[in-house]
């Protein structure tokens, strides 16, 4: 029995030794790991080191509890070896206490080494701190800027709606104020003397008098700009056959500009024993005593289509050319049904054709200036200009039907007359060439 108990005791001791070795090895490895981690985080603050120590203590307490549980299990298995187990427990307790003592010493040594290392590192890091201060300030400013940016929170839907409403209200208020101001300005203008028509400028009237136009316009002292009807005034003025078109412009604050385009008076036609003005549109002005009639030619002998063609030819001439014409007579021949005779204001007779007379008469001012005249202004060579075919000067010879009463007593021309004839013919030839080139 003693041998068995000894063997059992030895086996139990061996098991205990193995467990102690296992626990020591595992605790050693764990301590090494924790030490390596502690050295890695040695640059951290003291709070980290205290947390590390607390963590190691927790591991140690776990191992201690584990060993106690194993010892309790073994006590339950063998009731006979109760005394031996108590001895073992005492030994294990002593071993655990020894391990606690060793562990506490190791932790104290580690803390001392960390303190020494920190003390040794502080003088080395001192010069770095001076350089790092500026860097820290820059990082702080950057962080502050970022924080300011990040502090801007996104707007919610309600806030966006409020902003939209505010903007809409501002726009509405501005529009309303502008409208109110405009209405106020308009009302002030309407009821002030500025809106009364003070000036009427009439332009383009040659045959119709200004007083007659003002009478038709009906502008009074109390007439206002906004009540004056341009449409009615234009219709009333265009009822006059002399007026071709009218344009009226209102110029603020109180001026009317009236631009008139008239129908030209191209001729005077005999009607019921009187000579009445004939307009370019073919209308006769009846009862026009107040019309200003300038030097208009007298038309005689025209009827039907020939009259219309002659009216068209005269309307195509410029007013300057028409002033040279004193009379136009329809004088057809057997071969030329469109033959006409023109008597000019400077004493010349011109024969031409209705279809071409308007184009050829535009050169008449040059013809008249090239003629040779005496001191009294009369022509040295009496004759007529034929524009029916080309342009030629034909002097009067003897008594012909085409000669006037003053020309019947004309005899042979002198040398001066022949020279004047040659000069006039040369001018007519030049004009004839120019007209052929233009055509």
From Swiss-Prot:
Q: Extracellular side of the membrane: what ranges? A: 195-439
Which regions are flagged for Acidic residues bias? 11-20, 87-96
Cystines in this chain? none
Q: Transmembrane region positions?
A: 174-194
A GO cellular component annotation in the UniProt record: cell division site
Query: Where is the stretch described as Disordered?
Result: 1-96, 119-149, 396-439
**Record's subcellular location:** Cell membrane
GO terms under biological process = FtsZ-dependent cytokinesis
Q: Which regions are flagged for Basic residues bias? A: 26-38
Topological domain spans for side Cytoplasmic: 1-173
Compositionally skewed regions (Polar residues) per UniProt? 119-133, 426-439
Record's compositionally biased regions (Low complexity): 77-86
Record keywords: Cell cycle, Cell division, Cell membrane, Membrane, Transmembrane, Transmembrane helix
Please tell me where this protein is predominantly located.
Answer: membrane
Biased region (Basic and acidic residues) positions are 64-76, 405-424
Q: Where is the POTRA domain?
A: 195-263
Q: How does it sit in the membrane?
A: Single-pass type II membrane protein
- So what does this one do? Cell division protein that may be involved in stabilizing or promoting the assembly of the division complex.
Q: Which family does it belong to?
A: Belongs to the FtsQ/DivIB family. DivIB subfamily.
Q: What is this protein called?
A: Cell division protein DivIB
**Organism listed in the record:** Staphylococcus aureus (strain NCTC 8325 / PS 47)
